[in-house]
Amino acid sequence: MTQEEVPLPAGAVLRPVGAEQWGVVAWLWQAFRHDLSPVVGGLPYADGRYGAAPLQPFPSPDGTGYLAWRPHPNTGEDAPVGFVLVGGLASDRRTVAAFWIAPPLRRSGLGTALALAVLERHPGPWEIGFQHDNPSAGAFWRRVADAAFGSGGWVETEEPVPGRPHVPPDHFIRSLA
């Protein structure tokens, strides 16, 4: 294991996304958007893929990514089982721009450990957004915020979605330190 790697539950390891691995993130982005589609009403475009424009700012001085890897059960080779995109690195407040864990590994502790490891890698104030109609994400991020920032070390706000007055407001968790 290298200095860049962090061991995670479920036999996984956290690694920064390498230059040659952004294509892997783009494939996982499709799974992320598929999972989110019932919440945001998202549909694939004519080519069968979900929009990936939010990936354009990555990588950059302001944004980076991390992959969770573990041996594939059928082949034993390392396979990606989750990712996190972090924005705001050149700003005063870091953001979780996207977060996804493969469904079979959800509720294994992997997601919480991955989130906490990434938050720890980038000290400073954080902002984590999630959709009002995604109560599982809300419960998850509130637990992570308590673990990362301490009870009372964060606030949650609701804010209108820009340009979409017909949808419920988004929620944002912001650390106080």
Which role fits each region the language model picked out?
Residues 12-27:
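A short beta-loop-alpha structural element at the N-terminal edge
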Residues 101, 107-120:
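Conserved acetyl-CoA-binding loop-helix of GNAT-fold acetyltransferases
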Residues 97, 102, 106, 131:
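Residue-level recognition of the GNAT/N-acetyltransferase active site
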Residues 121-136:
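Conserved GNAT acetyl-CoA-binding A-motif
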Residues 141, 145:
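Conserved active-site tyrosine of GNAT-family acetyltransferases
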Residues 67, 77-88, 95, 100:
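Conserved beta-strand in the GNAT
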Residues 33, 38-74:
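Active-site rim helix/loop that mediates acceptor-substrate recognition in acyltransferases
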